[in-house]
């Protein structure tokens, strides 16, 4: 259900703002988005997994907070990130 270490490392390299960056909002949102997408697929077959659904909702809320922070801080970085991840239509 979770993402692998290799996938997490790939996301860190792809969305890092500088070398060795692991905690920027872009990296955190990318990792959360990957985990959310994985869980969304899980819930298509396990509809009654309400404990897992609670975790999913917490992840979505955390991603929303990070995106709001980034939007208030630097709108251009926010727009670039949502375009790369394809999370807004």
UniProtKB/Swiss-Prot annotation:
The keyword S-adenosyl-L-methionine does not apply. One of its GO terms (cellular component) is cytosolic small ribosomal subunit. Keywords: Ribonucleoprotein, Ribosomal protein, RNA-binding, rRNA-binding. InterPro entries: Ribosomal_uS15 (IPR000589), Ribosomal_uS15_bac-type (IPR005290), uS15_NS1_RNA-bd_sf (IPR009068). Pfam families: Ribosomal_S15. GO terms for molecular function: rRNA binding; structural constituent of ribosome. Belongs to the universal ribosomal protein uS15 family. PANTHER family: RIBOSOMAL PROTEIN S15, BACTERIAL AND ORGANELLAR, SMALL RIBOSOMAL SUBUNIT PROTEIN US15M. HAMAP family: Ribosomal_uS15_B. One of the primary rRNA binding proteins, it binds directly to 16S rRNA where it helps nucleate assembly of the platform of the 30S subunit by binding and bridging several RNA helices of the 16S rRNA. Forms an intersubunit bridge (bridge B4) with the 23S rRNA of the 50S subunit in the ribosome. This is Small ribosomal subunit protein uS15. The gene is rpsO.
